[in-house]
Each structure stands twice: as C-alpha cells, then as structure tokens.
Amino acid sequence: MDPRSEVILRQQDYLKGRVLLINAPNDALVSQLPTEIDASVWTWNYADYQGFLNAGATAHFSVEFPLQEFDQAIIFVPKSKELLNYILHVVMSHLKIDQSVFLVGEKKGGVERAAKQLQSFGKILKLDSARHCQLWHLKIEKTEKIKPLESWLKTYTVQVNEQELTICALPGVFSQTHLDVGTAVLLPYLNQVKSGRIADFGCGAGIISCYLAKANSSNIIHALDIDAFALQSTEMTFSRNGIGSDQLRLQPVTGIADAPTELDAIVSNPPFHQGIHTNYDASEGLCQNAKKHLKASGELWIVANRFLNYPILIEKHFGQCEIKTDLQGFKVLYACA
C-alpha cells in the first residue's frame, strides 16, 4: 500500500460522513476504510480510475469537482503547484465553513510547501509525520466563489512550418507555459507524416494534434492521453485555433493497447512521468505494440531523449527504425509498418 494511504488509515478516526479522496493512489485504501465512511474518489488519471471501478469504489474521472455534496475532502498532493492551486480553489468553493480538509503527501513531493498554500483558508495542524509523509488538517474558515475552468488556462503561441498555433493548457499539463524541447525538435517533421487517421499518443495540450489537423482538413486526429486535464486542454486548443470538432476524437487511455486500430500514423512525444516518479512503461509499450494499431505501411513517429533505447525496441518490432535527427538531446525516430 502507498505510504500516504497508510498515514490516512492510521488517522482514520478524524474521518466522518461523505469523504472525497482527491488524486488518491490506486491501492486498497478505500476498501480498508470503516464502513460508516462514505468514500468517493475524484481522479484525472484514467488508469487509476479504471482501477477504482474494478475494485468496486465510487470514482469520478473529470477535471471538475464531482456534482454532489461532501462533508470532508482528502487531497493527495499533486506534483504541480498550479494544479494544487486549482484543486484547493474548487474544494473551497464546494465545501462549507467549519468542514475539514486533509492534505497528505510525500516530503519529497512538496507536502510542506503545499501545507503553506492551505494556510490561506484557515488554521492548519500537522496530524502525522511518518514514512517520509505528512498529514495536515484544515478547518475551513474561508470559502471561495467558483471560477470558470477557462480562467485557469495558460496560453502561448507556437510557430511551425509557416503555421501559427495558439496552445491552451490547464494546470498540471505537460509544458503548460511554453513549448518543450522534445516537441520543438519533432515539429518540423510533422509535414512528412502520412495523412488520414492519426493518433497523437500522450497528446498533452494538443500541440501535435492541432498542427496535424490544421495541416490537412481531411485528417482525423485521435488525441489519446491518460490525463483528463490534457484531453480537456487539447479540446480547448482545437477550439481556440478554429478547428472543427469533426476532426478530433478525444479518448482517455491507460496505454497504447486502448488506441484505435487501422491507423495511418501514430505520432508521439511519449509520456514518462507518473506523478513525481519516472515511469517508462507507456512509452516502451508504444514502441513494442504500435505496429498492431497501424495499417500496412502506417507510420510511427516518436521524439525521445537520446539516451533511451527506443530505436532498438522499435527495430525489434518493426524490422527497421530510422533516426531522422539527433538534436538538443532528442532523437526523432521513424518506422513504417
């Protein structure tokens, strides 16, 4: 069990009524809470959401607070400070004065910094500190009026192959405020991508998806991501750039296995972070299994750190892998099914 969940179980006497667990790890916590606690989970991680459903828990996969009332909330500190700001805001706009909010996180994950953010809503108390984790309690003294989701957007402009794109990114989304180096290295090659049905695996704020849709109005883009905030950001990016929704198919995925088949191309700056931890499972799975989702002569385009052994993985499963460029620490890799 996750050590943060162990802290919650150790201090379960503080819990009562309808309790919302926010960004909780996918473990046995919910099933081990006392039966008199009516626990629900709000997550934006699709793999965790599927895990909670399979375990019989009440779970919500969304970027917005669940549409019901709660007596308490437990916030598992996210990696992003901006995302925590958003979560605190929506919690304080849905819960009431004198209700309890708990904050739990790893010390290396910034729980002490997060506790300081909590202070602006009332008096806080540290309830537990063990297993490199801390648990804080807040009795709400100040609530907030809900702001529209759009007010949390960050936007920036990207110029590529004579196209200008406006990128919209919500809190917690990869490269929320600027174009990342890996995608910047990949973008000049997108005009070579085969037209048709194209999947953007790990779509993030929708930079790759938006370019491919704008480059050819007949392209159908399957924007795939594990994160609800990324999918919502991609939809907002398409809208901001005047691209019709008929070109976009948004799909939450746990990995490449959930992707459509018979695709003309898969393009990806693959994800490798899971919270504060590094996890290459999704990107390695993409290299190993992408061919199953492509038509004959379909294309795989990936940008990745040069130190990763993806060319070897791709060559093993495709029979070949071409390195299109090696620039600023990133390689653009190409293979044909």
UniProtKB/Swiss-Prot annotation:
Compartments in which it is found: Cytoplasm
CC terms in the record's Gene Ontology section: cytoplasm
Catalytic reaction annotation: guanosine(1207) in 16S rRNA + S-adenosyl-L-methionine = N(2)-methylguanosine(1207) in 16S rRNA + S-adenosyl-L-homocysteine + H(+)
Key words, A-Z: Cytoplasm, Methyltransferase, rRNA processing, S-adenosyl-L-methionine, Transferase
Main location: cytoplasm
CDD domains according to UniProt: AdoMet_MTases
Subunit structure: Monomer.
Protein name listed in UniProt: Ribosomal RNA small subunit methyltransferase C
Organism: Acinetobacter baumannii (strain ATCC 17978 / DSM 105126 / CIP 53.77 / LMG 1025 / NCDC KC755 / 5377)
Protein encoded by which gene: rsmC
